[in-house]
Amino acid sequence: GKHCGNPYECGFLAYCQSQEPQAEQPIKWLPGRLSNGLQAHIDAHGLTELRDVPDELLNDKQQRVKAVTLSGKPYFDQRAAAQALAAYKLPAYFLDFETIQFAVPIWKGTRPYQQIPFQFSVHRLSRTGKLDQRAFLDVTGNDPSKAFAEALIAACGERGPIFVYNAGFETARIRDLSERFPRMAKSLLALNERVVDLLPVARDHYYHPSQQGSWSIKAVLPALCPDLDYGDLDGVQDGGMAMDAFLEALAPQTSKARKSEIEQQLLTYCALDTYAMVRLWSVFTGSALKI
């Protein structure tokens, strides 16, 4: 009932729901906030299946998700996706961060639960289609922030779009770094001015039934680029696992051999994140470059 999530979500909610009949295509796959009218209709009729929700109570994006889910046929407006990215010329950079946070800060100048970037990957795509990759990873146990900022500025050059997936995350980390290191602030904030978010392009112009209401890169990538699979990675396959691996690498009891193994797993995982963006960009733009 409503009390299960008010004022906070009950810790047993998942368990209780597991005892109930599971919807084949659940309403929770609908993106965005449900309108008051839609929620009232769902509650009044006890609806759980997406197919039973009236179209007239859905916004355009929700209608699209419902239609794709029921038909099993993906939606892709490639022309509109290409148009959205047409202004951004090569060379281009594709950037991803990995971060860690501590309830009790372990590094001077950081605050509780502050997202501290410890790793990045950057792929650079030239006008001729040449693809280069640069990476940063610090598992020494020292505060990685300053070295991270210096390496990031060097890796991203001075011109060309910097593509990310969910720009709010990377740009916020860059702002944090600019505040901590005023001497680098101008160069860091200049990076933010070049950031272009691929997430809205995916959200507005692409949807596959396998996404199940999510536009995370790990939901979109297997649909658009089935040859790439995070599940094939050894050890680190998502951001949460990257955090856990980083903490293990910092632990005093971790052997040198294990630490080296973790480093390689982290580098491989983050590199796939940025290569995935290159591939998404290629599909969205209809690029003829062989990447």
Describe every region a protein language model picked out.
Residues 79-158, 179:
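Conserved RNase H-like, two-metal-ion catalytic cores of nucleic-acid enzymes
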